[in-house]
């Protein structure tokens, strides 16, 4: 998600992709030829599969005898056949950290106690929060969790799907960075990500692609930028980030997104509901907006109310210097921000309803 790996740059940068001619079907044909070639060798050795060849060095030989070769190379021709067949893959660790967190949290819930946990995390730790959410549902402890919320503080680089499918009462805080699919399908709770050891105002990429994908609820605060497809299919989640890449808010139907930085191309494609408040930092801003996105509009009283509340929450959760600077310029917000979606013409009743919803989030 830092876009620094050569393989990733080739995949996402049009200027590099243009250097590769051909079609996907040609790659498929290449692998088909390789498979047919392997099959012909298997027939020569009169075996049914590659598994039958593994370890059979007796089928190998030296093509050219060279006296200058070290004698130790002849050891390569010793048979290494084992009674145990290798499965052909390596089993991935099934989430030791996730199981540990679940065990501690469930123990606290059965005693009707809140749990506060701190652990280091690595990118091998995937779907943190999903397992415990499932266990809470299976054991019908949802109401107990709401009354006794759990707070999980982690440090490091979290793996895929950090905070996926979490529910009300689960609060995740990460000092570091996270991979793709943060908050995927989350229905409640909160996720906070604070980059470790950086003072950059919004420039740091703190999380990967498809953040908040398909979320139905909950709150997400990231003190940094995120990758492509931020908020896709969001129907109820609330999030504040400090910039994002292409395809943000695609097919969004509900919820509220606040973007305190630049956006990528194709913003808002197919968006039919919800609201996105964007800080206008780019020249030719309109060029980044999809033709199928809702028309942008000026901020109204509800937008100002929500922006103020969520900026304060963002600062409270992350300590964001960027958000602090923006909060000082409240009188200029109408010029600084534009809004997609939401209610254009508001009444006093609408404002009262918005205030009640914001208060209910605390």
Segments from the language model and where they lie:
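Long, distal/terminal scaffolding or interaction modules
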Residues: 15-48, 54-57, 77-362
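Short glycine/threonine-rich loop-to-helix capping motif typified by GTGT followed
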Residues: 56-71
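Short, solvent-exposed coil/turn linker segments
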Residues: 49, 68-76
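Single conserved hydrophobic/aromatic residue that forms the stacking wall/gate
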Residues: 1-8, 12
